Amino acid sequence: MSSVNVDFEQAGELKIGQVGIANLRIRTLDVPRLVREMQDRVTRAPKLFGRAAVILDFGGLAQAPDLATAKALLDGLRSAGVLPVALAYGTSEIDLLSQQLGIPLLAKFRAQYETAAVSPPPPPPPPPARAEPAAPVARPAPGRMQRNAVRSGQQLYAENCDLTVLSTVGAGAEVIADGSIHIYGTLRGRALAGAQGNPDARIFCRDFHAELVAIAGHYKVLDDVPMDLRGKAVQVWLEQDQIKIAALD
């Protein structure tokens, strides 16, 4: 079984959100380096990143940037070909910075990075009580099935469930699921599984020519996929925050 494990992320970790908005998690305030990396992304995948909306996330830094550095970064990213539209991670410093820059503050992507807070010790158990009838167990949401082709410009979203496509996902089309995605035709567009941050979601496809695949925000574009996997039946999964792709044959 052949697989690929290539990490192109360097100074900034780019994640793709549920509706195609990219989240740039800043790891260093080396503005020229960040701009060069973004220029490289746009050059390698212009249809994906050219004039793409980007949210800047400074939450991974020990200290928020000063206003001059933040302005330089926004200007540099615009020159690289993307459109910074908001700041993520709502600390008071970032809140003030967003006001000074005149752009919104969003917290949509925070859960993908933050570790869960340490829970307090559980309280002592209550005294035994008379048994009550068990509440009915909620059934998981049924998977969504798409029988017809998903054409260029269309977006299909399966909320809180898996998505099965029995036909083709055309170039420029986008299929998104909070669970896994199964495509029984050709995938030429984009497939984003685990859209709400589920790292165990997978993508299965019979004929792989995807513009982009993403799981829990981590992504890989077609140019980064070895030629021997293109046109094959493959599965895509996430391992240690890196996308892996392997043939099913």
From Swiss-Prot:
InterPro entries: CAP/MinC_C, MinC, MinC_C_sf, MinC_N, Septum_form_inhib_MinC_C. Residues 119-130 have a biased composition (Pro residues). The keyword Cell division applies. The keyword Magnesium does not apply. Residues 116-149 are annotated as: Disordered. Residues 131-142 have a biased composition (Low complexity). Disulfide bonds: none annotated. Keywords: Cell cycle, Cell division, Septation. It holds the Pfam family MinC_N. GO terms for biological process: cell morphogenesis; division septum assembly; regulation of cell division; regulation of cell septum assembly. Belongs to the MinC family. Interacts with MinD and FtsZ. PANTHER family: SEPTUM SITE-DETERMINING PROTEIN MINC. Cell division inhibitor that blocks the formation of polar Z ring septums. Rapidly oscillates between the poles of the cell to destabilize FtsZ filaments that have formed before they mature into polar Z rings. Prevents FtsZ polymerization. This is Probable septum site-determining protein MinC. The gene is minC.
